[in-house]
């Protein structure tokens, strides 16, 4: 719930995105309900099994619940997913001139690439959820053309950190593009930097420290 409040206050969610977390040691996951505002209570977290059956929680499921269901099914390594509609990251999906790449240290978390799912429609069906999971592949995140982004993590700290720095990197890249030709980080350097950040978990600790402060009621 702290993660939701943090992302809402930071403008990532604004009533349209959603967060999910796999429940450890089970074949179930929690997903924030449809039309959730800044205020969140335990019943706003819906619990589903891998057959799509709702086990707990109150309220309607998000229309794009297949995003979470199909990625969890396809990626046993993923334990948390965030879908949001970041202004700057999404802008790069509609540019014929620029492809979003790491341009800032923390953006190297996505040095493995940012595949684009080329369907702007809501991921509201099983078929589209499967297609998105396929587009994501083994990557940390994917962009949805003219729509938004999906960020995964081994835990909630990783997914929140990923969403935070995906949008920050996109914002910095946008500013660089407006100044002229952007100077992207060399891929080899980006891969080395990413490995170090992931190994030390420094970014995760720092972002989660902000969540602990800003995510209170």
Predicted regions and their residues:
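Glycine-rich flexible loops
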Residues: 1-217
């Amino acid at each position: 719930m702290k993660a939701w409040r943090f992302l809402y206050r930071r403008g990532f969610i604004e009533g349209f995105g959603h967060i999910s977390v796999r429940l450890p040691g089970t074949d179930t996951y929690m997903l924030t309900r449809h039309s959730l505002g800044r205020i969140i209570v335990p019943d706003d977290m819906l619990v589903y099994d891998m057959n799509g059956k709702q086990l707990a929680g109150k309220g309607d499921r998000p229309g794009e619940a297949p995003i979470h269901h199909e990625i969890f099914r396809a990626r046993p390594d993923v334990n948390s997913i965030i879908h949001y509609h970041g202004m700057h990251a999404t802008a790069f999906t509609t540019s014929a001139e620029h492809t979003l790449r790491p341009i800032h240290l923390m953006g190297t978390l996505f040095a493995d690439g940012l595949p684009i799912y080329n369907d702007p429609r809501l991921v509201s069906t099983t078929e589209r959820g499967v297609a998105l999971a396929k587009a994501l592949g083994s990557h940390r995140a994917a962009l949805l053309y003219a729509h938004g982004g999906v960020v995964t993590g081994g835990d909630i700290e990783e997914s929140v950190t990923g969403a935070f720095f995906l949008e920050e990197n996109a914002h910095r890249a946008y500013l660089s593009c407006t100044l002229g030709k952007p100077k992207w980080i060399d891929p080899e350097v980006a891969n080395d930097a990413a490995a170090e950040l992931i190994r030390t978990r420094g970014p995760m600790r720092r972002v989660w420290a902000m969540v602990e402060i800003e995510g209170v009621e």
